[in-house]
């Protein structure tokens, strides 16, 4: 039994959920999201709640996945998502100019990123980055791409890390 799939989603008053063929559209105060919704999972909308059901036992995993995806879409169009990254290292800097993010993270050249559609990038300080958007998947993917430029290393902890990430540190070699 999919426990996540059986949970009911509360739909806020300012949000509308519509199904058009195999696509589902969620509109809210922050914007609009559309994505493919598997036809093997059905949902019923009544009294500001959404109930999910599946056609067969083979679709258990899909049941919970589609419910979680729709819940994150609803949360995205109402509140949005924010990922915060921190740069740790001497001379590591980030500068956001419009849709471009420029990183100086120890390479001989600056690394430039173009923010995807629907994502805004801010740099409150030279060593912190804030990524905001309505799509949890797009915000998380963009944050992961930035982190992959210079992931935190375990000896000194230098690199780009998520704000709440714990970097497990290792001891260096012991001398004779």
From Swiss-Prot:
Keywords assigned by UniProt, alphabetized: Ribonucleoprotein, Ribosomal protein, RNA-binding, rRNA-binding
GO biological process, one term: cytoplasmic translation
Source domain of life: Bacteria
GO MF annotation terms: rRNA binding; structural constituent of ribosome
Cited NCBIfam families: L6_bact
UniProt subunit comment: Part of the 50S ribosomal subunit.
Protein's job: This protein binds to the 23S rRNA, and is important in its secondary structure. It is located near the subunit interface in the base of the L7/L12 stalk, and near the tRNA binding site of the peptidyltransferase center.
InterPro entries assigned to the protein according to its UniProt record, in alphabetical order: Ribosomal_uL6-like, Ribosomal_uL6-like_a/b-dom_sf, Ribosomal_uL6_a/b-dom, Ribosomal_uL6_bac-type, Ribosomal_uL6_CS
Name the UniProt record assigns to this protein: Large ribosomal subunit protein uL6
Matching Pfam families: Ribosomal_L6
């Amino acid at each position: 039994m999919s426990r996540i799939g059986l949970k009911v989603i509360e739909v806020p008053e300012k949000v509308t959920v519509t199904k058009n063929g195999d696509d589902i559209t969620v509109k809210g105060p922050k914007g609009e999201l559309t994505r493919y919704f598997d036809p093997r999972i059905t949902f019923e909308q009544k009294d500001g709640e959404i109930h999910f059901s599946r056609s067969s036992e083979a679709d258990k995993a899909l049941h919970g996945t589609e419910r979680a995806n729709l819940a994150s879409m609803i949360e995205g169009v109402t509140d949005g998502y924010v990922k915060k990254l921190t740069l740790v290292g001497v001379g590591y800097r980030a500068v956001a100019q419009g849709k471009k993010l420029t990183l100086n993270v120890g390479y001989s050249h600056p690394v430039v990123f173009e923010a995807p559609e629907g994502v805004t990038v801010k740099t409150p300080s030279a060593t912190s980055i804030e990524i905001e958007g309505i799509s949890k998947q797009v915000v998380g993917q963009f944050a992961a791409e930035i982190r992959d430029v210079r992931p935190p290393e375990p000896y000194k902890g230098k690199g780009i890390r998520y704000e709440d990430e714990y970097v497990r540190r290792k001891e260096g070699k012991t001398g004779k």
